[in-house]
Structures are given as structure tokens and as C-alpha cells.
């Protein structure tokens, strides 16, 4: 697991290739990142199912309650199959754009 920080955003990238252990590590170390916007980079995983992505739902809910953004990045995926409560995008650039827009919305009181 590799963690990069850019301003108020933390990018968490899986370096092992084992989705289950990555999810466990992110969950266990969540307190370390809870004060930042989070981008979960799953670009190295080409075989993720909708159910795999849904496993991040509890973390996403908790994070959004704290008024922070939680974005998952993965490619080759049916983005319409994911619940609206989860934010899933195809690129890191798009993830940063979403976080920027959500920050503006929070600043405006939405």
C-alpha cells in the first residue's frame, strides 16, 4: 500500500495486487486518513466486480458524514452499476476534479 498526500487529499494505492488485504489495510489504518479527502486508487485491478467496490461503502459513508470526499478510481468498470452513494471514476484527474467540486459545494453550504 502506497500513500501519497497532496494538500488536503490522500491517495491510497494498492501495490500488492491483493484486493482483500488492501481493503483490510485501508480499513485498519482509516483513522490515519480520516481528516483528509481520500482517493482509493484501484487502477491496477482489472477484474473488480460491483460487489468488490461495494465493500468500500461503510468507509465511504463514515467519511462523507465527516464532510470529506471519498473517491474510488478504477478502469474497465460499469459505473452505472454502483450505488449513487459511492463515487467511482475512471481516472485520478477526474477524482481530483470531483473532490474540488465537493469542496466548493461544502464551502457554499450544500
Tell me the role of every PLM-derived stretch:
Residues 1-9, 19, 74-110:
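STAS-like cytosolic regulatory interaction modules
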Residues 1-28, 44:
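STAS-typified acidic loop motif
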Residues 54-58:
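Alpha-helical scaffolding segments of alpha/beta enzyme cores, especially the outer helices
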Residues 60-82:
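Short aromatic-glycine-(Arg/Gly/Cys) micro-motifs in beta-strand/loop hairpins
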Residues 8-10, 35-40, 67-71:
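Hydrophobic beta-strand segments of well-ordered beta-sheets in folded domains
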Residues 41-46, 68-74, 100-105:
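Short C-terminal domain-edge/linker segments immediately following a structured domain
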Residues 23-53:
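Short, glycine-/small-residue-enriched flexible loop/hinge segments at domain edges that mediate gating
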Residues 4-6, 31-35, 63-65:
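Flexible, charged surface loops at secondary-structure boundaries
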